[in-house]
Amino acid sequence: MKKLLFAVFSIVFSLSLLSFVAPQAKKAWDIPAKYKAMKNKKKGDAAAITLGKTMYAKSCKSCHGMGKGDGPKAGALKTKIEDITTKEYKAKSDGEKYFMSIVGRDEMPNFEKKIPDEEERWAIISYMETL
C-alpha cells in the first residue's frame, strides 16, 4: 500500500512540475531610429504628470502595477513585464520609452488606437518617470 501511495504521489508531483511554464526570457527591443530620437516636451510638467497618472491607471496599471510589473494581470502573461522603476529603464531615451509603452510588441499591446491623442501618450510617459 505504501509503495502504491508513493508511486501515485510521485506521478502526480512529476505531472505538476510539467504544468509550470517559465516566463519568456527578456529579449531586446528593436526600436526604430525615428522613435529613439523623439523627445518628451512634457517631461516634468505637473499637469502632464497628473493626466498621465489617470491614463496609466486606466491602461497600464492592471499589468504593470506601480511600475514593478506586478499588477493583477501580470501573472497570467508568458512574458516577464519590464520593471519601469529601475535605473536601466529610466536611462532609456524618451523615444525608446514611448515605443515600448505605446507601440508595444508581443504581449505588450499597441495603444496607438486606444490612446490616439499624442499629448495623452506623452503624459503617461511623464507619469511613468515619477515611479
Residue ranges and their predicted role:
Residues 32, 47, 53-79, 107-110, ...:
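Periplasmic/extracellular electron-transfer cofactor-ligation site
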Residues 82-91:
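Short microdomains enriched in Cys/His and/or Lys/Arg
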Residues 90-100, 104:
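Short Fe-S-cluster ligation motifs
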Residues 22-24, 75-82, 100-131:
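Axial heme c-ligation environment in periplasmic c-type cytochrome domains
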Residues 44-47, 51, 55, 96, ...:
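Extracytoplasmic/secreted proteins, especially bacterial periplasmic and envelope-associated proteins
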Residues 1-23:
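N-terminal export/membrane-targeting signals
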Residues 44, 89, 115-116:
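Alpha-helical hairpin
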Residues 25-55:
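Electrostatic cytochrome c docking/interface patches
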